[in-house]
Amino acid sequence: MTHVEMKQRLTPLYGEREAQAILRMVLEMRFGMSHADILCGKVTQLSADDTEELEKIIARLEKNEPVQYILGQSDFYGRQFHVTPAVLIPRPETEELCTWIKETAGQSSPKRAILDIGTGSGCIAVTLALELPGSQVEAWDISRDALLVAQQNAERLGATVKFVENDVQKVADPSMKWDIIVSNPPYITLQEKAEMEANVLAYEPHLALFAPNNDAMHFYRLISHYAARNLNDGGMVFFEINPLFSDGIKETLLSHGFTDIVVKSDTFGKQRFVRGTYTKDYLEGQKTADV
C-alpha cells in the first residue's frame, strides 16, 4: 500500500489536506518515519507486521475514529499528552486559555494555589504546573479513568499535580483556599448535536461533552458559587465557555460578587473564555451599602 493509495482512501472522509496531515502523523509517530522518508515512498518498505498494523490503522480511520485515540497521544502546548476514550482530546482553544492564565498569573506571587475542575487528560493542570513553576496545582474529576490518564501525563511530563476524585456538585469545604480556579466543564446542549462532527459524537466521552439535564449553565453556576467562597482575596476564576451563553455566564459571576469580568474571544473570533476576580473589600462594601 503506497502513500498515494492511503491518501485516496481517506480523502473522501477528511478532505485532501487533513488526510495528508493525518497520514504524516501516523507514519511519523507510530512508524518513526521522517517527512523525507514519506516523500521517498519508504512506506512500501515496511515489514509485513508493520504493513498489517498500518492497514488496521487506516481501517479505523475510515470509521472516523480520531487519530489521537488510535495513536494514544495528542499535542497540547508543545507537549505530547496521552489520551484514551476516557478523556476529551485537548483542543487548540484550550491552549489559548492556558496562555491567558499564564500571562495573568505571571504578575502575581509564584506560590499560587491553582485548582482545575474537571481535569480530563490533565492538559490544563499539567501545563500550568510546568509553565508556572512554584505553583501548587490540584485537579479534580469525577472519572477515575480520566484521573488515571491525567496522572500518567503528569508523571511522564514531570509535573507536580495533586489529582483528586471529586465532584463539584457535592464538595463543600470552606477551608480550601485558591488563588486561581479554572474549568472547561461540559457545556454543549442537545440542540447543538447536529452541528458536531461525527467522530466526536461517536468516540469522545459524552459525560465530558454535554451539559447535564441540557442545562449549559449548570457547572458555571456551581463553580461560581464554590469559587466565591473558596478564592483568596484577589483570586480569579477562569472558564472556557459555550459562546452562546457568554452573557449568562457573565451575569452568573456578577451575581456571585465577582468584579473585573472579562470575556475573551479565541482565534476564530468566538467568545470562548471568561475571567472574574473575587475582591473581599468589594463584597464587604456591598454588604455595608445594603445595610
Q: What residue spans do the PLM features occupy?
A:
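N-terminal auxiliary segments of SAM/dcSAM-dependent transferases
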Residues: 1-71
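S-adenosylmethionine
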Residues: 131, 135, 140-284
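Residue-level signal for pocket-adjacent positions within structured domains
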Residues: 33-34, 41, 65-66, 71, ...
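Alpha-helical elements of Rossmann-like donor-binding domains used by nucleotide-donor carbohydrate transfer enzymes
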Residues: 5, 9, 25, 53-56, ...
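SAM-dependent Rossmann-like transferase core, predominantly class I methyltransferases
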Residues: 42, 55-133, 137-152, 275
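An acidic site on a long C-lobe helix of protein kinase domains
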Residues: 50, 90-93, 219
